[in-house]
């Protein structure tokens, strides 16, 4: 790295990829019901709960993390949430690890982006990509992932589904 203290993280895709690989190993060894949670931001759900119902997942409110903002019932799907609240460079949180692709500064379009997809790697990469992409360019990015469901939380706390189909 160019300066002391600089670092590089592959969390924008690595956790999702590893989650998928771990679940592949579990499935290859006979596990047909799996809830794989890799640190609260990437979750892969295989099959249904033992009672036959879909897995119930609660998404924390990024403005009040002890509160559940949205509850989803999912089976054979994956979810990833990206937000600037994870790794902060200073106490206010204005400067964090997710950079706007057009300005090179910490992205501030949203405070959280959650994506439901068939692959955890796709959900992980897409949630991070959408978080750092200016909103006016999000539609073009989403067009390549028609099966993904996307929920964004804006800085004022309002939530909006970017994807079609009402999966949130």
Please report, for each region that a protein language model flagged, where it lies by residue.
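Mature catalytic core of soluble alpha/beta enzymes
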Residues: 1-168
